[in-house]
Amino acid sequence: MSHVVVKNDPELDQQLANLDLNSEKQSGGASTASKGRYIPPHLRNREASKGFHDKDSSGWSCSKDKDAYSSFGSRDSRGKPGYFSERGSGSRGRFDDRGRSDYDGIGNRERPGFGRFERSGHSRWCDKSVEDDWSKPLPPSERLEQELFSGGNTGINFEKYDDIPVEATGSNCPPHIENFSDIDMGEIIMGNIELTRYTRPTPVQKHAIPIIKGKRDLMACAQTGSGKTAAFLLPILSQIYTDGPGEALKAVKENGRYGRRKQYPISLVLAPTRELAVQIYEEARKFSYRSRVRPCVVYGGADIGQQIRDLERGCHLLVATPGRLVDMMERGKIGLDFCKYLVLDEADRMLDMGFEPQIRRIVEQDTMPPKGVRHTMMFSATFPKEIQMLARDFLDEYIFLAVGRVGSTSENITQKVVWVEDLDKRSFLLDILGATGSDSLTLVFVETKKGADSLEDFLYHEGYACTSIHGDRSQRDREEALHQFRSGKSPILVATAVAARGLDISNVRHVINFDLPSDIEEYVHRIGRTGRVGNLGLATSFFNEKNMNITKDLLDLLVEAKQEVPSWLENMAYEHHYKGGSRGRSKSNRFSGGFGARDYRQSSGSSSSGFGASRGSSSRSGGGGYGNSRGFGGGGYGGFYNSDGYGGNYNSQGVDWWGN
């Protein structure tokens, strides 16, 4: 670098001293339109059209620069540190793209519109076309298409699904559809359905889509893994594309500009856990591809500042856990004034986790439109009395939809119950894993966090590639574990109940209840991680004296699903019922045709099938007593797993799905 001292030319000093800023003569031949402006010497003889002062009415030098600053997180990152330059670039980083771009994107919220405006670099809020016709698709993005739809949709057992009974109750129930093309959902939705390779709607989708498109409130109870998420996302997004943003977009613009504004989502989806919220969000991304709708997700356990920055880019469909949403509302970042669609997913789980005060605060004590004005949907695998009472408060003239038996398990899941003492569980687990193919995903449930860490460490030292998740793990660690499991790098996942609900992990072949849960509903949700969306699966449960409280309900569930019942379980249930009294029985009786099994509006009272009836309703073979019949039989476990052991469970006819 040169350090030569430059002395001012006396003639130049004299010129500057005599400079008159208000003189037209100083313009150096510039256009008279610049009267009164000081023109730097190096620009004085240029054409007016090339002058730096050629600004638009807003004062920005060009549309590119204007757009670059009109949206936080745009692709133009001039003047920012290197870390911030990745925000909004559409990369698949986990939370903040700092050295973690290998992750598959769960929890990633750093995409401004998911590539919709990435070529032009401007925000949807500055594009006047967004106010015109939201039903028209935006230009495609090959990169984004590959990112969203490369997962595929394989192994669907639709033939089996067609036999599942459906019951819909309520006034003027719309007719169901047989194909997606039977109802007009618009060009964007139909194109995205094709990209996801959905060929036919599942039973819950056949009935729920026309109900929601008809703007009716819905309480739907369907088997776990039956396609509930798409059942509400497809019609809701279709309706948003048809109706446009309405007053919500206007409210955002009036509230503030350039990122400092409250967002007014048109649709709100509440979910009990972070994992389920992220899964719904990822599905929403797929079905909002090439649209002007921007989904967002907020949940606890993650950086709230990062989530706020994501919200500030725009939010039309919000997926949230109740606690974090209340926090966002109290911070003034979210307003529900224009929320047209409310979805409560896994509603029973939210009540079990104690979220009812937050849910009522969100729905009843804030600015959300009342029932009858908004459209409300509740989805879950079980609907006990408490949930149906909540539906009475939140839903208006709703339709009750039961797909399969309420609170039931899928017949696509072969259930095996084996007697294993606590000291023998680890060795028995090794026998099972040894008989399982190395490429099969196996989910092992335990009751405690320490138990999860201990079992993971044991399996690791036995040479198995495994990982674990539980409530004490950080959000990043949990997402990394799920990524390793989904990708098959660690085909064994040890989990506590935090992963039991809502996790949509395709191709899970085997669920093992290393520790059985204390209530039968948790059992239903755990084994529902396999056999999803018509695929075949296997569930194995280790049973001993500690699990006596669910004996009766477990027996009823196995009988109902036409599963093999060990004779020792029958004997224990009989003894427990007649000798042990009711003190040890589980709190649930909904697998016997009680309140939760049907629409309470049509039930005159809670009825229950007697123990003797359920016990005598099926014939089962097997040796008596506890001694020689606690395993899978003479062939051993490996023989069952490697044989075509699923077939026998699908030949039954006339299943009494409704508990009559």
UniProtKB/Swiss-Prot annotation:
A motif (DEAD box) lies at residues 345-348. Residues 603-620 have a biased composition (Low complexity). There is a cross-link at K213 (Glycyl lysine isopeptide (Lys-Gly) (interchain with G-Cter in SUMO2)). The modification N-acetylserine is found at S2. It catalyses: ATP + H2O = ADP + phosphate + H(+). The modification Phosphotyrosine is found at Y103. Residues 15-34 have a biased composition (Polar residues). Probable ATP-dependent RNA helicase. During immune response, may enhance IFNB1 expression via IRF3/IRF7 pathway. This is ATP-dependent RNA helicase DDX3Y. It comes from Homo sapiens (Human). The gene is DDX3Y.
